[in-house]
Amino acid sequence: MSKKPKVASNTIALNKRARHEYFIEEEIEAGLELQGWEVKSLRAGKANIGDSYVTFRNGEAFLFGGTITPLNVASTHIVCDPTRTRKLLLNKRELDTLYGKVSRDGFTVVALSLYWKNAWAKVKIGLAKGKKLHDKREDIKDREWQVAKQRIMKNANR
């Protein structure tokens, strides 16, 4: 008999604050250029993308602010930098559209989630526009109203 495949979440890290701070206009999947110790740390779930964003240099995109904590058993002859900038692997067309919108339209690009797709580590990046304080309050009111509405409907059906 063959073994059943493990049912596990493919998500490594989430940036929940990004959806609170920004309006996400578009989401794009990008690959990451990683070193060996980083892949081992990601498999252990030691990643944080809470303050990460994307910048453009020489026609390439780089992820800044993402932290991958090295494992204790990492190699001694390799210097592990947890906060190094990591190159994003995107198509030329995707790079051009993102760069154009960021430079002209006042958008920013933030990391939304880090996950496994087959054996590859991928990052979902979002083209985002910053929210004002009143927008955040409006979102909170809408969320609270949805919860209250569900509660009312649940009690009405009894």
Curated annotation (Swiss-Prot):
Example of a GO biological process term: trans-translation
Record keywords, A-Z: Cytoplasm, RNA-binding
Superkingdom of source: Bacteria
Cellular component GO terms held in the UniProt record: cytosol
Disulfide bonds: none
InterPro entries from the UniProt entry: SmpB, SsrA-bd_prot, SsrA-bd_prot_CS
Secretion signal, residue range per the UniProt entry: none
Pfam families on file: SmpB
GO MF: RNA binding
Location (main, coarse): cytoplasm
NCBIfam families: PRK05422.1, smpB
Record protein name field: SsrA-binding protein
Species assigned in the record: Glaesserella parasuis serovar 5 (strain SH0165) (Haemophilus parasuis)
Underlying gene: smpB
